[in-house]
């Protein structure tokens, strides 16, 4: 009985350390110099819900918490509602998927930056005086945001694969210790 309790505590501590590592990584990724929209944040929103066997909705909020912590440091902005809303929709979408495999991961890694691009740039168009409030202005906003979208796509696919492969290696390594 005692070894089962120890294993549960050890597992809980390892999970806590992993989640803390992800939070620090995601926050730091916004604080260090990087190309625009080239961070692991969307990949974190895609991957984090799969870290827990018995998932809860709290895991959906972790990327938003990371955004909030980094916004405390770098400053709040007028598009926070659109940004946080996009991450909430991404998180809820991912949360409803039960099994992670490479095909699912790649699909989510392409869909999630697209969700972010559509929502956040709609917010830019709606709130910025730069664009006319008609279809031409909306299209102009989306076209001018394409380089940022490209960075989001590449970084999300790249970081999602890194997270997925790291998870696979850790699971394989931990299983081999007990066999």
Indicate residue ranges for each PLM-predicted region.
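Hydrophobic transmembrane alpha-helices
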Residues: 11-51, 57-58
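Short helix-perturbing small/polar motifs within transmembrane alpha-helices
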Residues: 62-63, 82-121
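Residue-level signature of the transmembrane alpha-helical core
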Residues: 24-27, 47, 64-68, 106, ...
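Interfacial aromatic-anchored transmembrane helix boundaries in multi-pass membrane proteins
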Residues: 29-39, 63-96
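Hydrophobic alpha-helical transmembrane segments
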Residues: 16-21, 57-61, 81-85, 106-110, ...
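Structural signal for the C-terminal ends of transmembrane alpha-helices
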Residues: 28, 48-54, 92-101, 165-172
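N-terminal amphipathic/basic-hydrophobic helices that include classical n-h-c signal peptides
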Residues: 1-12
